[in-house]
């Protein structure tokens, strides 16, 4: 197995008296793709913010594993980004504002080329389609050539065909950058086929495992075809408990398979 990049040890997070994350233990390795899934309010975005250091856990520890003499470099793509429509800004200018030190023109150009939108450098951010906007955010995340790329619901506002294209692009970025990828998905069952590990989250880690190939599911193949099945996969949950309407754990006397509403 590849060397670890980051380790989360018994992470708990509370906002006021409200538990958000409970007992999270997770190790992310070099060049690994980890997809985090779970219902709304499960703590997915909070977990990626803990991973990126945007918020500190209430208790527990995070270990960054140095890569030779280089510190861990994290690229982050947020779930949402709202721009003031009264303030026009071009794509290239938007990218120049990334990080404490403005990236060079050549770095911005290279990032846009890597995500396939070099032609949009002079476009206004407000005129972009949903898929184009997501690619700009992705370009921003890779400007510093991270060895850990964290993507919080990167497929928002993108149709199914656009999702497949983005999944292919993400796989290419892993190969080009040799980086690990942590990706949040709002879909409980459909994940990127190249995913090495799936974490099902509902405040705590409900289950953790490998996705099953979507090619085994004839109904999906009928809808989207074999080509789509190469880029998407289905994850089957295997829980020994369920959650009540408040998100609290309720145990099962026997092993139970279920879904979150």
UniProtKB/Swiss-Prot annotation:
It is a peripheral membrane protein. The keyword Zinc applies. Its EC number is 7.2.2.20. GO terms for biological process: response to zinc ion. GO terms for molecular function: ABC-type zinc transporter activity; ATP binding; ATP hydrolysis activity. It catalyses: Zn(2+)(out) + ATP(in) + H2O(in) = Zn(2+)(in) + ADP(in) + phosphate(in) + H(+)(in). Keywords: ATP-binding, Cell inner membrane, Cell membrane, Ion transport, Membrane, Nucleotide-binding, Translocase, Transport, Zinc, Zinc transport. It is found in: Cell inner membrane. It is an enzyme of class 7 (translocase). ATP binds at residues 38-45. Residues 6-227 form the ABC transporter domain. GO terms for cellular component: plasma membrane. Its main location: membrane. PROSITE patterns: ABC_TRANSPORTER_1, ABC_TRANSPORTER_2, ZNUC. SMART domains: AAA (SM00382). CDD domains: ABC_Metallic_Cations. Belongs to the ABC transporter superfamily. Zinc importer (TC 3.A.1.15.5) family. Part of the ABC transporter complex ZnuABC involved in zinc import. Responsible for energy coupling to the transport system. PANTHER family: METAL TRANSPORT SYSTEM ATP-BINDING PROTEIN TM_0124-RELATED, ZINC IMPORT ATP-BINDING PROTEIN ZNUC. NCBIfam families: PRK09544.1. The complex is composed of two ATP-binding proteins (ZnuC), two transmembrane proteins (ZnuB) and a solute-binding protein (ZnuA). This is Zinc import ATP-binding protein ZnuC. It comes from Saccharophagus degradans (strain 2-40 / ATCC 43961 / DSM 17024).
């Amino acid at each position: 197995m590849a060397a670890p990049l980051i380790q989360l040890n018994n992470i708990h997070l509370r906002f006021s008296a409200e538990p958000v994350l409970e007992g999270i233990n997770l190790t992310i390795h070099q060049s690994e793709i980890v997809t985090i899934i779970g219902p709304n309010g499960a703590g997915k975005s909070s977990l990626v913010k803990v991973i990126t250091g945007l918020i500190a856990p209430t208790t527990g520890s995070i270990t960054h594993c140095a890569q030779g003499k280089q510190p861990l470099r994290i690229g982050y793509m947020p779930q949402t980004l709202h721009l003031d429509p009264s303030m026009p800004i071009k794509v290239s200018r938007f990218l120049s504002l990334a990080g404490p030190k403005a990236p060079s023109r050549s770095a911005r150009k290279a990032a846009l080329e890597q995500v396939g939108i070099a032609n949009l450098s002079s476009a206004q951010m407000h005129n972009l389609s949903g898929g184009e906007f997501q690619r700009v955010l992705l370009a921003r995340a890779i400007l510093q050539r991270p060895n850990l790329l964290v993507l919080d619901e990167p497929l928002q506002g993108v149709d199914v065909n656009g999702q497949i294209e983005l999944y292919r692009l993400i796989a290419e970025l892993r190969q080009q950058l040799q980086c690990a990828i942590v990706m949040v998905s709002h879909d409980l069952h459909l994940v990127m086929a190249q995913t090495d590990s799936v974490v099902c989250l509902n405040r705590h880690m409900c289950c953790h495992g490998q996705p099953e190939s979507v090619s085994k599911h004839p109904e999906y193949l009928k809808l989207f075809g074999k080509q789509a099945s190469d880029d998407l996969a289905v994850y089957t949950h295997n829980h020994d408990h369920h959650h009540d309407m408040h998100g609290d754990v309720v145990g099962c006397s026997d092993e139970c398979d279920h879904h979150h509403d």
